[in-house]
Amino acid sequence: MFRKKMLVLALFSIYFLSIEAVRNESFPALLAFGDSMVDTGNNNYLLTLMKGNYWPYGWNFDSKIPTGRFGNGRVFSDVVGIILKSSLQCFFVISAEGLGIKRIVPAYRKLYIAPSDLKTGVSFASGGAGVDPVTSKLLRVLSPADQVKDFKGYKRKLKGVVGRSKAKKIVANSVILVSEGNNDIGITYAIHDAGMRLMTPKVYTSKLVGWNKKFIKDLYDHGARKFAVMGVIPLGCLPMSRLIFGGFFVWCNFLANTISEDYNKKLKSGIKSWRGASDFRGARFVYVDMYNSLMDVINNHRKYGFTHEKNGCCCMLTAIVPCSNPDKYVFYDFAHPSEKAYKTIAKKLVEDIKTGLA
């Protein structure tokens, strides 16, 4: 009787492990492109003022050491990587971390990238980057073209580790997480001298979607196939925007949010049209709704355990001394969500990604 039970258990184990093996093949890696929402430290290796490798950034990160991430801990790409990998582990396993779940997504420009990280994902993103050609030049960060160039270098390294055939398969099945538009709207268009004088918001947002499509097409031409394209966050509700334009009640900036919504609407519509298009044959796309997800947290912050939705925890005139508990703040600094805010919105968004790209 005991032998029968053990045999049945062994068969079930083999069955479920085989299912998990197939599922793990679905998304072998996470490759992140774009801006500071998904930059894990590439700007550390650039001559730019756009850096997050100093105190108080990284306060809640491992060993409390700043890594170049713009926040108190993990950024959105890290959190997505954790959830994707966790959800793909066999449910028999108690200690997921002991199995080597990807707890962080390393920056591609790090001086050393372990072969295991090449196989499971890196970030090519650069804080301050944008698809408008002016944005990255203005802030001296990695442009979309620079990130595509790094992507090509990554592919060469990956081939050296796993071989040409497997490298091609990994790239084609990886989640390609793209975050663009935030700096284009929030800095280049809204603040840069020429921005609003040259074109209307509606014309500019249409151009942004076109530039984003070109960036994604460049990635597609180099083997990427599964794209999770992030919309912009509610830029009018950033602590910086509230402080400058919010008046006595520190309200959200209506115009900035209207432009953000218009861009997101056009991006979402564009993504629908790209599916099945001849120039994107075999590609899959999913829209990642950052705007409404974060706005829900802002509007219902107490429900999610936050007490501060208007001000950042640090790095502002209203927070020269960092707060004692970043988990109580939706935003860590003047423009970037806290790690807890990312974690709060990520679970639902990752489910959308898995469903849309499966």
From Swiss-Prot:
Gene3D superfamilies in the cross-refs: SGNH hydrolase
Superkingdom of source: Eukaryota
Cell compartment(s), UniProt: Secreted
Residues of the active site: 36, 333, 336
EC identifiers of the protein: 3.1.1.-
Pfam families referenced in this protein's UniProt entry, alphabetically: Lipase_GDSL
Family: Belongs to the 'GDSL' lipolytic enzyme family.
Protein name, per record: GDSL esterase/lipase EXL5
Organism: Arabidopsis thaliana
Source organism phylogeny: Eukaryota, Viridiplantae, Streptophyta, Embryophyta, Tracheophyta
